[in-house]
Amino acid sequence: MTKYVFVTGGVVSSLGKGIAAASLAAILESRGLKVTLLKLDPYINVDPGTMSPFQHGEVFVTEDGAETDLDLGHYERFISTKMRKANNFTTGQIYESVIRKERRGDYLGKTVQVIPHITNEIQAFIERGAASATCGEPDVAIVEIGGTVGDIESLPFLEAARQMSLRLGRNSACFVHLTLVPYVATAGELKTKPTQHSVQKLREIGILPHVLLCRADRRIPDDESKKISMFSNVPEDAVISVWDADSIYKIPQMLHDQGLDRIICEELKLSPKDADLSMWSALVEKLENPKQEVTIGMVGKYVDLTESYKSLIEALRHASIHTSTKVNIEYIDSEELETNGVDSLKHLDAVLVPGGFGRRGTEGKIAAVRYARESKVPYLGICLGMQLAVIEFARDVVGLKQANSTEFDPDTPERVVALITEWYDREGKVETRTEESDLGGTMRLGSQRCPIKPGTMAEEIYGKDVNERHRHRYEVNNRFVPQLEAGGLIISARTPSEDLPEMMELPRSMHPWFVGVQFHPEFTSTPRDGHPLFRSFVEAALANKQARGVQA
């Protein structure tokens, strides 16, 4: 039978519940347990797919095509279990499901209320999510409840967790509470009062945490831990200090050293083998001792909030581990390139243009593409970054001066990039879209496998085929492909059913390393294995740096 660990947060948001939950999962997996994770989001949106990156950060796409919270990306990077749509749900989905049932008459004329109907539905979603784990029936399901204790939006989820722990019985569920212990510089001390009040709030609704994870900018002294223990009624050895680390991959060892996994296993009456965190130690060792260094420019419009590119940043970090290279990322606002030109790119070893939406900043990104192509600087374009690379090539090499995407200019006569109106999903079902379709949940989403053209750089990187995740509405228009190919551009991968261009590149006679991909390879990169595309990109940046050094 699956046992549950509920992870809650207090005092403020953005303390790192997702990292804490994923780190605990990594330790338990290293002890031989089958583990899955779920994220419960209290907002009323059905999913984060239409939310601004400034509001929500990155939207992580699962293999089965769900648009989910960025924490699911952390989950997949820390454990081997793949996430699915059932691993993330929102208040919006819960209410949508309950209202559908009410309309069908499933409640037999009863008054539908938050308790028991909403809380029962939350419990059903949790158990369904755990049961659908790709690892088979999990030994432990770690359930991260979004928001902060005390928020009105989180109350139904906390109540559902309380009811569920009572229903499952002793040693079947436990609670881990992550809270802030701020350092007040003027007083020169850590303050435990916010943590005391946060635990008090939990106790008011009937939840007694078994473990406290105390976030601070430094390790919490023993006397402060004793005070927290006394006022929160949590054993002193279960008051665990979680201080700021320069790498998230150090957190599993930090938590294990303080006995978190031992406490959880004792509470849940589990007797697994000892933890083996040697893989994590080796990763950290490689990360901290690089043999070389490169600087990569990431040109986007969400650069003030790097959470928007969380998986991409981690994928570059994974490549740094597997190439023994320190990767410095410079975030470059594409709108500034429109105003000030591309001089700020000239010291870079490589240029990356990530995915994005909307017209704002696109001409700055196109300027970055042109600079990379003409200066023979390694270029990687992801999703929109590939589309803009094709547009730049069409304009400046092929001579289609009005080439554009219908996303930015619906009236352009040279629709090099246009809306996909029909495609097959990963199950082979035909999906159709029009300009009038809803925005939510109407993109091409999820994994799809497609063959790679022999003799290409794509084949050198991936092999005979590629299986990556997608999140896009627009696609390179096949009507213009013959002209693009005549100019030298190579379409190196296409979807098998609809013949949609998936990868493009320039031949080495034109450029040493210039690649665009319509999919999002960052979603499948892990610290354990890295990713072949990002590894190749970093190696190309190294080669460019060395070549420039020889010339200098």
UniProtKB/Swiss-Prot annotation:
SUPFAM superfamilies in the record: Class I glutamine amidotransferase-like, P-loop containing nucleoside triphosphate hydrolases
Binding site for CTP: 13, 151-153, 191-196, 227
Root EC class: ligase
Activity regulation note: Allosterically activated by GTP, when glutamine is the substrate; GTP has no effect on the reaction when ammonia is the substrate. The allosteric effector GTP functions by stabilizing the protein conformation that binds the tetrahedral intermediate(s) formed during glutamine hydrolysis. Inhibited by the product CTP, via allosteric rather than competitive inhibition.
Residues holding UTP: 13, 191-196, 227
Keyword Ligase assigned: yes
Disulfide pairings: none
Enzyme Commission designation: 6.3.4.2
Cellular component terms (Gene Ontology): cytosol
A biological process from GO: pyrimidine nucleobase biosynthetic process
A Pfam family the protein falls into: GATase
Residue span, Glutamine amidotransferase type-1 domain: 295-547
Binding site for ATP: 14-19, 71
Catalytic reactions of this protein: UTP + L-glutamine + ATP + H2O = CTP + L-glutamate + ADP + phosphate + 2 H(+); L-glutamine + H2O = L-glutamate + NH4(+); UTP + NH4(+) + ATP = CTP + ADP + phosphate + 2 H(+)
Binding site for L-glutamine: 356, 384-387, 407, 473
Active site (catalytic residues): 383 (nucleophile), 520, 522
Alphabetized Gene3D superfamilies for the sequence: 3.40.50.880, P-loop containing nucleotide triphosphate hydrolases
InterPro entries from the UniProt entry: Class_I_gatase-like, CTP_synthase, CTP_synthase_N, GATASE, GATase1_CTP_Synthase, P-loop_NTPase
UniProt binding sites for Mg(2+): 71, 144
Start and end residues of each stretch annotated as Amidoligase domain: 1-270
The protein's assembly and partners: Homotetramer.
Additional detail: CTPSs have evolved a hybrid strategy for distinguishing between UTP and CTP. The overlapping regions of the product feedback inhibitory and substrate sites recognize a common feature in both compounds, the triphosphate moiety. To differentiate isosteric substrate and product pyrimidine rings, an additional pocket far from the expected kinase/ligase catalytic site, specifically recognizes the cytosine and ribose portions of the product inhibitor.
Function comment: Catalyzes the ATP-dependent amination of UTP to CTP with either L-glutamine or ammonia as the source of nitrogen. Regulates intracellular CTP levels through interactions with the four ribonucleotide triphosphates.
Protein family according to the UniProt entry: Belongs to the CTP synthase family.
Protein name: CTP synthase
Gene behind this protein: pyrG
